[in-house]
Amino acid sequence: MSKKFKMKRAKNLNGFSIIHDYVTPDQEKKLLKKINESEWVVDYQRRLQYYNYRNELFEPYDLIPIPNKIPKYLDQLINQMILDKIIDQKPDQIIVNEYKPGEGLKPHFDRKDYYQNVIIGLSLGSGTIMEFYKNKPIPEKKKIYIPPRSLYIIKDDARYIWKHGIPPRKYDEINGKKIPRETRISITFRNVIKEKVKHDNIVYPKRSPN
């Protein structure tokens, strides 16, 4: 991760950047091993891991602190991103998502009222197409392929004007070639807006592991 890398900015999508091969295949393998050795919960019908904060699944969907602290191996990854000048503020919330082939993510904004501007994602195990949508002034859709081991940044217009999602399918078509999806692990790094955290809601029920 300390090697030289090139950050590419998406054309006509202000605020989206991507670094291909931010981690090596060996680093990817070690990260996946650490992740799969950690405890999962099942929300949204898929497996996840939450660290430091999460928003509840039930109204009023409070942003709450949780006892699961950011593990050392992810903290080391954060420190490397700071050394590489990708970020200048240490993220304080992480979500790890597992996506099986055929699973997707409906178009959405990351909560504008709970999280700060910069969202960082690291994709492991498989690539995927991420789609961006906006309705005004005219409907538009953009597709960006996220290869495995890539790190991407969503901020500014890409964060606040464009919704993003992942179409649910078992392969993606890139330059006329069908690329099968495999199990993909997505690590998302955010900074919470501290004033929005509900410290009086400290109930964090255990959900189904596995």
From Swiss-Prot:
Any one Gene Ontology molecular-function term assigned to this protein's record: demethylase activity
GO annotation (BP), single: demethylation
Disulfide bonds: none
Pfam families registered for this protein in UniProt: 2OG-FeII_Oxy_2 (PF13532)
InterPro entries, alphabetized: AlkB-like, AlkB-like_sf, ALKBH4, Oxoglu/Fe-dep_dioxygenase_dom
Sequence ranges assigned to domain Fe2OG dioxygenase in this UniProt record: 90-193
Protein name: Uncharacterized protein L905
Organism: Acanthamoeba polyphaga mimivirus
